[in-house]
């Protein structure tokens, strides 16, 4: 219940700050933000992936010291000082992590990945539009 209350508060705050912005782009952004708030709530409530995660398929994380990960929340899969990115990206460690992500073995509300995950998931579009209309 506390998560639900907080989610509603976040949505109201976003709406307040964006209410003077009336371009179509602004309305789409507001719809996406509303959808993402609902997505975070559902993810935390169900403790599982709600939409597919693209980490490891179109994303990579490179840390200043050269470590590479598929996501900031997953273990490092290699280091650019030791191997090139192609070798790291195609490594068995990377493939294992991709399989686990695809199977839904990890779930999160990662603010950097979730917007792209939602945009690349067409079944989410009706809910994004509903959030646009509500606002």
Descriptions of predicted regions:
Residues 48-50, 67-135:
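Flexible mid-to-C-terminal extensions adjoining Fe-S/redox cofactors in radical SAM and related proteins
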């Amino acid at each position: 219940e506390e998560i639900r209350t907080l989610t509603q508060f976040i949505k109201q705050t976003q709406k307040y700050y964006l209410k003077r912005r009336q371009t179509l782009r602004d309305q789409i952004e507001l719809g996406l933000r509303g959808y993402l708030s609902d997505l975070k709530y559902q993810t935390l409530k169900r403790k599982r992936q709600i939409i597919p995660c693209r980490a490891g398929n179109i994303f990579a994380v490179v840390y200043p010291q050269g470590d590479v990960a598929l996501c900031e929340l997953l273990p490092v899969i290699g280091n650019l000082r030791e191997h090139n990115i192609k070798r790291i990206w195609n490594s068995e460690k990377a493939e294992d992590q991709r399989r686990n992500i695809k199977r839904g073995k990890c779930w999160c509300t990662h603010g950097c990945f979730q917007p792209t995950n939602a945009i690349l998931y067409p079944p989410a579009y009706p809910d994004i539009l509903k959030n646009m209309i509500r606002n």
